[in-house]
């Protein structure tokens, strides 16, 4: 299953990759992680239908994951579900505005990320399935 990870920060992308591992739970397919650092790269991938699930860093620069999530939900047909990583727990209401399907906060809790991502992976068949 293709999991796209969006953040300008290579350390955040590495933390997400480590939290996901080969698969975030035993009952979901293996994750093929695709890292992107820019909003244009993310939208090229989404336009091509190359993602099953998105993990978006709300603190990404210059395009934050919240705005990117909302834009994707508005513009991409059959947009993949999105897990949004917000700057603090109190920003959960912004995740609602952005139409994220799941939310966790920084600092990244690997167990919480894996749990939320596995839930999204269970809900959506893989591209090409």
Where are these regions (language model features)?
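Conserved acidic segment of CheY-like receiver
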Residues: 1-21, 54
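Short hydrophobic/Thr-rich beta-strand motif most characteristic of the beta2 strand and flanking loop
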Residues: 28-37
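Acidic, metal-coordinating helix/loop segments flanking the phosphotransfer/catalytic sites
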Residues: 36-53
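His-Asp phosphorelay/catalytic-motif detector in bacterial-type signaling
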Residues: 52, 76-81
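Conserved phosphotransfer microenvironments
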Residues: 52-73
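Alpha4 helix (beta4-alpha4-beta5 surface) of REC/receiver domains from two-component response regulators
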Residues: 87-104
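C-terminal output helix
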Residues: 108-117
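The C-terminal output helix
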Residues: 118-129
């Amino acid at each position: 299953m293709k999991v796209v990870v969006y953040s300008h920060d290579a350390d955040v992308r590495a933390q997400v990759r480590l939290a996901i591992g080969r698969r975030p739970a035993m009952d979901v397919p293996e994750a093929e992680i695709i890292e992107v650092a820019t909003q244009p790269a993310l939208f090229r991938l989404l336009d091509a239908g190359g993602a099953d699930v998105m993990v978006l860093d709300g603190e990404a620069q210059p395009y934050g994951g919240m705005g990117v999530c909302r834009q994707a939900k508005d513009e991409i047909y059959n947009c993949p579900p999105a897990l949004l990583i917000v700057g603090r727990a109190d920003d959960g209401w912004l995740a609602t505005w952005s139409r994220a399907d799941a939310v966790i906060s920084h600092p990244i809790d690997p167990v919480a990320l894996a749990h939320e991502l596995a839930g999204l992976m269970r809900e959506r068949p893989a591209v090409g399935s």
